[in-house]
Amino acid sequence: STYLEHHLGVLRHGHGRHIWFEVSGAPSDASSLLTAELRLHQAPTHSVEPADLYTVVVHRVNSVDNLGGMQMEQVAAVNTSASAEGWLEFNVTAALASWLGAPADNRGFFITLHPHTQP
């Protein structure tokens, strides 16, 4: 089941997106959680070289200070190319299990895109 209720605005931190998931509708017993997956749909881009490679990284936000600075930990990463189209899948089971046990710790995910550098 999906428990995404809303997508709040964007916080700037490099070139990324900060997204929150309302998980209060999910069962609070994390021991019954088998797996949790975040899926992002990628459309091909025509503004860059189609063969360009990128890594999409999902970070769990641990804290946000008064100036918008974030302490984060990497949860999952997927490599893709600029010409790829389809769903990128990220295993976020550990983060969701933690949030189910301590909902106040749910500060969302921060998603970043990193180009691969050519030698």
Predicted regions and their residues:
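Beta-strand elements of modular eukaryotic interaction domains
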Residues: L8-L11, P27-S31, P44-E49, A77-T80, ...
